[in-house]
Design a protein with these regions (language model features):
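Bacterial Sec-dependent N-terminal signal peptides
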Residues: 1-24, 33
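Interaction-mediating elements
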Residues: 20-149
Length: 149
């Protein structure tokens, strides 16, 4: 019985160690985050599909919740910043009004990509459907492939 309890305890400790290690990004990722967001404290880290993701409050974005993505080498791939409808460029909101009037709700997120390009992710909702579209700042629909997936 004593061996059994020791074995179970050991396995439990190993599981905890491995699960915790996956939530701590490598030093290169932490350093990139600190360089890119020196005024922000790192928040909740997660790791999926080869990408380290951190959600945090950023002073540069009106203390809003921001999510930044880094690859395993510490390269900053993109940043997701939720936007109020009033802060989104007019061509984007105009296009949503004209092309998606059947949707009762639209949430906007600006995605700043590493190369300097930005796209707006528009999550549209109504009673029966959800749809996500991507637009550039001129309101043109575009394809977006997340570099962190």
């Amino acid at each position: 019985m004593k061996k059994f309890l020791l074995t179970i305890t050991g396995l439990f400790c190993i599981l905890i160690a491995f699960s915790q290690s996956h939530q701590r990004p490598p030093a290169a990722v932490q350093k990139s985050f600190q360089n890119d967001y020196p005024q922000s404290k790192s928040g909740q880290w997660s790791h999926s599909n080869g990408s380290w993701n951190v959600s945090f409050t950023d002073k540069d974005h009106n203390n809003g919740e921001v999510t930044a993505h880094f690859n395993d080498n510490g390269d900053h791939t993109d940043t997701h910043v939720p936007y109020d409808r009033n802060d989104v460029p007019a061509p984007v909101t105009d296009k949503v009004k004209s092309n998606y009037s059947g949707y009762s709700k639209a949430d906007f997120t600006r995605i700043d990509q590493a190369g300097g390009n930005s796209v707006y992710q528009v999550n549209l909702k109504n009673k029966n459907a959800h749809k996500t579209v991507y637009m550039d700042e001129r309101g043109n629909e575009t394809k977006y492939k997340a570099s962190h997936r």
